[in-house]
Amino acid sequence: MQVFVFDNTLDGLLTAVFDSFFLKQQPEYLLAEGDQLPLFADEPHHVVTDSEHAERVWKGLEKHLSKEGLHMISVSWLSEERTLNQPLFNFICKVFRTKVKELERNASDPDVLEVRNSCRRVMHEQLRMKQFIRFQKAKDGTYLAVISPDHNVLPLIIDHFQDRFNDQPWLIYDAHRHYGYYYDGSAISRSEERFSRNAETDL
C-alpha cells in the first residue's frame, strides 16, 4: 500500500503529482504531515515541496484544462478540507494520464465531483461574506471587520471590498486563521499585527 506524505500546501500537492509520475507510482493515500498512517502501509514517500516542480505541473494543467478547471482547483484548495487532498490529487493525475479534454466537466467521475462540490462550497461562502460583512469604525478612522469563515475565503473577497470602499482605510481580519488584509486608501497589504494593535487601543 503506497502512501505519499506532503506538507499540506498546494505547491506540496502539485509536487506530489510530479513525484507520482517521476517515480511511476500512484499512491493509494495522499496524507498531510501529522496524519496517521493506515495499517499495513509501505514505507511512505515524503514529498519534498519543490516550487519548480509545482510550476511545471501547473503549466501542464493550463494546457489541458479550461479556465473553469483551473478555477476549480484553486478555489477548492481554499476549502482547507483535509478530505479533499486525495480526490484533488487523483483528479490532477487523471488530467495527465487520460488527457481527456475538459475532464473537469465529467460529473460522473467521483474525484471530479468532490473537487467541484468543494469549489461550490467555497464560492457560496465567499458570496455570503460579501453580503454580510459589517464594519466597525475604530478611533483612528479605520473600519474593522472580523470574520471566522469555515473556508479560507478572504483572498476571494478582497477585490470586492477594495472596489466598494476605495476611499477609506479598512481591515478585514480572519480570527480563525489569524491574518487579515489592510487597505490604507491606496494599496492592500496582508496583515497579522494591525488588528491586535487596534483591538487593544482603539475599539
Predicted segments with their positions:
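Short, hydrophobic/amphipathic alpha-helical patches that form generic packing surfaces
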Residues: G12-L23, N90-K94, D159-D163
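Residue-level marker of positions within ordered structural domains that often coincide
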Residues: L23, N166, A199
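N-terminal ordered "arm"
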Residues: M1-S51
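Charged, alpha-helical interface segments at or near domain boundaries
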Residues: L31-L127
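Internal, well-folded beta-alpha domain core
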Residues: K101-R190
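Conserved small/polar residues in nucleotide/adenosyl-binding loops
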Residues: E193-A199
